Each structure stands twice: as structure tokens, then as C-alpha cells.
Amino acid sequence: ASLKDSYQFILDALDRAAELLELEEDFDTDTQGTLYDSIYFNEYTVHALRARVLLYMKRWDEAIKYATKVIDSGYYYLSSCTRAATSSASYYKYMWTNDFSTEAIWKVGFTVNAYGGALGQVFANYDYSTLRPDYVPATWAVNLYDMNDLRVSAFFQSFTTGYSHGLTWPLLIKYFGNESFTNYNILHVSMPKVLRLSEQYLIRAEAYVQCDQPDYGKAGSDISVLRTARYSSYGGSTSLNKENAMDVIEQERVKELYMEGFRLHDLKRWHKGFERTPQDQSLSNGSSLKVEK
């Protein structure tokens, strides 16, 4: 099938899913339970996935429409980096350490008796003694975060690795593992948060900027809402214009969605390439890679 036919197949499936999963008119979260942090599909799961697909298709106005449906529904709330969920974790960090969040639209449900792959294995390889990661965060990515951006402490922690060179580096702890699973000696296993509210804000912000009649004010407002939930303090507003808007949004997607599987799609959509820094290893073949835009 062509790419066009493949996308149409997806949109048709989403149309049917929206019909089957439509909420009842009298749906009430007080009596029927919340929709956030769900392992089940519902009408807004479909809207969120459709917004992502429409972004990839560059159908900006429709992406705005469906992201707005999710954002304005009132069923999901950005997890705060400043409000404490426990004595040791903010609500945002708790999303990654305990797999519970008011902004998760849909997650893959795991139990200690039935769980998927260890997402964090390659970033830590902890053996109860040392950490020997296969991959470490790139300096340019870590340096994107501002001083008062509290995502840093949720995503990264400096360790001295167990390798002979004794590298000390900020390692990715975003997927270090659900603490409940760790209690059963199940390491680096986390429930994938496939759809989150923060992504919907980023989808809408990008679509506002890329559409035929850009609205930089609304795009800046969406970035401000997200940063307010992520920073220790974020005063004022995010000023976007034709010259800086996409740079800001591109960086914000890296900072918020780091290592969640979006990067390649983003680079393709933005017509940007990348270059891998040559690695110090025994095999030179594949050690470096450059992909042009």
C-alpha cells in the first residue's frame, strides 16, 4: 500500500474506534471513575492518537482540533513538578517512578506477574552493584534544560559507571523502573505511557505555528502552560514569532519527550538530518552515521 493509503486506513480505523468508544452523554467521573492513568481505550484515547497522526500528516488544522478536544475535555491534568506526591517525589517524577499520573491518557498496564520488556535496561544495566549503561545521554540534550527546569531531576542522575574507565555521567533514570516492581527484584521495568497530555500541548503548539495562518500567541501560551507545570518557577509568557517559534517547539519536544520514541518522526517531519559522533570501539563499521535532511 502507498503511504497515503496506509494513513487513510489508520484514519478510517480511528473513525470506527471513536464511534465504538464514545462516552455516554451522562458520563460522570464522580460516579464512574476518572479517565486519566487508564489502561483501557476510550473516546479521548482515540482523539489523542488521531492528533498525533494528523501532526505526522501535516494536517495542521485538524491536529489542532483533536488535540484541543483532549486538552479541553477536563479529564486530564498536567502532572506538577512542584507539588509533592510523596515525601521524595513530585507528581511528575512519581509518573516515572511509580507509573501513576493524571496526565497519562493511555498506558500499557503491567503487574508483577505479567509485564513487558525492561525499557530502562540499556540506559542503566544495574546489577545491584554497578551501572554499566549501553547508552548515555548526549551532552547537547542535557544542556537544553534550563536551571529551573525540574524535569532534569526526574530524567537524569549522575553516576560513576562500573566500566574500567570509571566514567561519571548523567544517566537516564526515566526508565530506571517502577518501585513496586523493584521490590520484587524486577529491574528497569516501567509501564509505557503511550499517550500523555503534554504531547497534546506540543502537537497543538506546532500546528498553530505551521498552519496557513500561524497563531504565535496561542502556540506560546501552550508552551507556557507546559513549562509552568515543569519549572520551579516560570513567570510571564513564552514569546514566539516567525523566527524563533519552531526552534523553541523543537527543543521543547526533546526536553519533554526525551527517549519516548518520537525523535525520528520529528526529524523526518522537520526535514532535518542527524550525525552520530564516531564511537571508540573495536569495529569502525557503523561507528559513525550521518543522515542528510
Language-model segments: residues:
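Active-site-proximal region of nucleotide-activated glycan assembly enzymes
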Residues: 205
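Active/binding-pocket-proximal capping segment
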Residues: 201, 216-232
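Structured, solvent-exposed acidic/aromatic patches
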Residues: 1-198, 210-217, 242-244, 292
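Long, intrinsically disordered, low-complexity segments
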Residues: 9, 118-119, 239-293
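Cytochrome P450 fold signature focused on the C-terminal beta-domain
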Residues: 232-239
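Active-site/pore-lining binding-face segments in mid-to-C-terminal subdomains
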Residues: 209, 228, 246
